[in-house]
């Protein structure tokens, strides 16, 4: 199936002391690199957030306006970048019929994305597909959505003046999506140092941040999916 991808790599990382999540490491790759791997197969990819550094050839980079305006504004910026993207011949390329929306702070999201793509091939996804974790929690930042419907949601939110600092659930309220159960742990995200420890995520060598060898997980403490909470959203 043909799809584009919008990868969200912004956010203030307030509970990580401002350490950018995109640069944290998991199994030898940054979380941004993990997200790019999860989105492999996309016809075009836009990374939304602060300067991501060197990206693979052809991957677009943009920023939500204003910066730190929330995930809904970031999705809007990513869609705009994809719509304006021109190919090697200088011609504007048509957008793909579906867009993968993916936050970069879920190191195991590749399993969830593969499950969504398999579900889309088995049955027409309509307005889109949204990942649902093993505990029943909906995760709109692992979603495969109709590009036309997603653009409609963004346009309507912009016309209402409700795009900035809006939740993704509010943005997608009028979109008919099918919920898809994804493998356990595939939507677990990094919002705190305890989360990082539980997921085997560390700071890069030589960077400023919490000592990755310091024990941070309390035995028996529950893992929570906190991407929504980190973006100021109500858990589903």
Residue ranges and their predicted role:
Residues 2-186, 193-194:
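Nucleotide and nucleotide-moiety/phosphate-recognizing core
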Residues 1, 164-236:
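Conserved alpha/beta core of the MobA/IspD/sugar-nucleotide pyrophosphorylase nucleotidyltransferase superfamily
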């Amino acid at each position: 199936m043909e799809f584009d991808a919008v990868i969200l790599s912004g956010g203030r990382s307030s509970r990580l002391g401002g350490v950018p999540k995109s640069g944290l490491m998991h199994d030898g790759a940054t979380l941004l690199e993990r997200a790019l791997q999860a989105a492999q197969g996309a016809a075009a990819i836009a990374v939304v957030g602060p300067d991501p550094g060197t990206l693979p050839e052809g991957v677009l980079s943009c920023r939500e306006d204003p910066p730190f305006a929330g995930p809904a504004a970031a999705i809007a910026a990513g869609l705009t970048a994809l719509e304006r993207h021109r190919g090697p011949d200088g011609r504007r390329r048509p957008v793909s019929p579906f867009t993968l929306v993916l936050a970069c702070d879920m190191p195991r999201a590749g399993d969830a994305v593969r499950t969504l793509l398999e579900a889309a091939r088995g049955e027409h996804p309509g307005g889109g597909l949204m990942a649902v974790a093993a505990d029943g929690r909906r995760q709109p930042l692992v979603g495969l959505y109709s590009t036309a419907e997603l653009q409609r949601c963004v346009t309507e939110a912009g016309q209402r003046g409700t795009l900035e600092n809006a939740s993704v659930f509010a943005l997608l309220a009028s979109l008919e999506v099918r919920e898809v159960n994804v493998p356990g742990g595939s939507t677990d995200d990094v919002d705190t140092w305890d989360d990082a420890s539980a997921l085997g995520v560390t700071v890069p060598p030589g960077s400023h941040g919490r000592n990755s060898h310091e024990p941070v997980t309390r035995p028996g403490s529950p893992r929570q999916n906190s991407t929504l909470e980190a973006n100021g959203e109500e858990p589903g």
